[in-house]
Every structure is written in structure tokens, then in C-alpha cells.
Amino acid sequence: GGVRNIRDGLAPAFESRPSLVQPVQCEQINGQPNMYLIPGHIGLAEYEVTLGIAQELSGSLVTLQNLPGSIRYLLDQTANSLDIDYVLVDMSPSLGAINQNLLMTSDYFLVPMAPDYFSVMATDSLANVLPKWRNWANSAQSMQVLKSATYPFPEVKTKFLGTVIQKYRLREGNSASSAFQTWIEEIKQGVRKRLIPALKDANMLLPESIYKEFDVDDGKPILQMSEFNGLI
């Protein structure tokens, strides 16, 4: 019994059931006693359209007021049930309503990159989209209808931690091969010249002194790792 995956956990909110959202029964990771996994579910995508409508119209449709705050509520309830300190969400590479909600109700976010054309383009896309998401979230958190919901929309405080560059070939000396290094430099430039200024204007950056303290200012990634499987 009990809730076994993220979709079933959200069902009371999205299917208007007369019951509250309950914590998910997480799977424990072998050899990692302090790590738990919330099982996903392909059916979560079925809620994408409904959530998108709710996030656009929740100010005028009371019947949808419980949806925008329900995902963060579920994660908080699940974390509290296991005395969890940190919740990490691995998001799909899309700009849909679920990702909009997940990112804007999180405390911090990292942007994973691969040294290729698509990540360069994605940097520009994020610079355009994330400020719009922030504007939506600012509006959502000020709506009385969402504040008074069963699952209130949380205070928005999302901040950018940095980028992680991965999936590239190494040459001798453990540095990226020249072809990959070209893309890496282009990504860094895009982050420095386009993404960071856009996030700064949207109040989505930490104080600059923090980035400098950890040597990740000026578009530098938090981590470069050719292949994460090599850490196992």
C-alpha cells in the first residue's frame, strides 16, 4: 500500500480527489543509507497540459488553485517524512509546464551542459525563457488565490549555482580534445555574456562574492567531468 511514485503522489491534487497529497514511499539506495529515490512514472506527462493551464489561469479559476503548489508540497512532505536535508531533481530537457514549476519552486539550480552545438543554443534559450518563468513565479506567489490554496504556492527564491560540463573526450594530460574545447569555450562565453546578465536582471543570482569565492565567476563551470560513469 501507500504512494509508490511521483505521479500517484500528485493524483489527489490533479484528479481532485477528496484526500490530501501524501509522502511517496521512497526506494533506498544500496550502500547509501542516507540516500532515497522517489520513483518516477511515465504517466506524469499526462499532467503537463493541466498544469500549464493552471499556471496561466489559476488567478481566475479557483478550481485549479491547488495545482501550482502541489509538486513542491509533495517533495516537502516526502522529505520531511524521511528527515531529508537535500532534495535533488533530475529534470528532463524541456521547457514544459512541469519543468517550469519544478525550477521556479526550487531553491537552487544547476545547468548541465555537453560541449556541442545544442548546449550553445540552449544557453541562449535559457537566457530568454528563465526570466519569463521568474516573472510568472513572482506573479503566482503574490496571488491570494494561490496563497490560500490547500497546497500554497511557495515563496520564490530560485538562484543559479552554475553549470556542469560533461560528456567529452580527453587527450593526453586529461584536458578536453581540441574539438570539444572549442565548444566548451563557446559555452563559457554564452554563459558569461548572455545567461548571467539575463539571470542578474531577473534576480536569480547569488551575491557575486560567492561565485568568486568558489572560482566559478565569469561563466566558469562548477565542474568539468568527461564522463561521470568514471566516478563509479
PLM features: residue spans?
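Walker A/P-loop NTP-binding active-site region of P-loop NTPases
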Residues: 1-19
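Cytosolic-facing regulatory segments adjacent to core modules
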Residues: 14-31, 36-89, 95
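Conserved nucleotide-binding/hydrolysis micro-motifs of P-loop NTPases
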Residues: 42-44, 116-118, 168-171
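P-loop/Walker A phosphate-binding loop and immediately adjacent motor/lid segment at beta-alpha junctions
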Residues: 51-52, 56-57, 67-73, 123-162
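A mobile, often basic/glycine-rich helix-loop segment
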Residues: 59-65, 108-124
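Inter-motif core of Ras-like GTPase G domains
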Residues: 70, 98-116
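Helical "lid/switch" subdomain of P-loop NTPase nucleotide-binding domains
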Residues: 91, 95-98, 102, 122
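C-terminal lobe/tail of nucleotide-utilizing enzymes
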Residues: 144-232
